[in-house]
């Protein structure tokens, strides 16, 4: 059986935590920022975890 390959797009966007959960950056932080408040932009800087429903599918993209 051939080796499983890591999905490179997912690998660049996600990191595995020590407990095996997936960490991701928040969306809406790239452009059109003038109409967003400073508080909103500050909160968008924080990272968050991938939801449990999505994590199962995404884990298949990152086998290693």
UniProtKB/Swiss-Prot annotation:
S-S bridge residues: none
Biological processes, Gene Ontology terms: translation
Keywords assigned: Ribonucleoprotein, Ribosomal protein
Stretches the record annotates as Disordered: 1-25
A Pfam family reported for this protein in Swiss-Prot or TrEMBL: Ribosomal_L35p
GO cellular component, one term: cytosolic large ribosomal subunit
SUPFAM superfamilies per the UniProt record, alphabetical: L35p-like
Superkingdom of this protein's organism: Bacteria
Single Gene Ontology MF annotation: structural constituent of ribosome
NCBIfam families: rpmI_bact (TIGR00001)
HAMAP family from the UniProt entry: Ribosomal_bL35
Family: Belongs to the bacterial ribosomal protein bL35 family.
Protein name in the entry: Large ribosomal subunit protein bL35
Gene: rpmI
């Amino acid at each position: 059986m051939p080796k499983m390959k890591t999905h490179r797009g997912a690998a660049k966007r996600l990191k595995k935590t020590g407990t095996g959960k997936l960490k991701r950056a928040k969306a809406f932080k790239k452009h059109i920022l003038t109409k967003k408040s400073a508080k909103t932009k500050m909160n968008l800087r924080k990272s968050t975890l991938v939801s449990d429903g999505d994590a199962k599918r995404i884990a298949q993209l990152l086998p290693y």
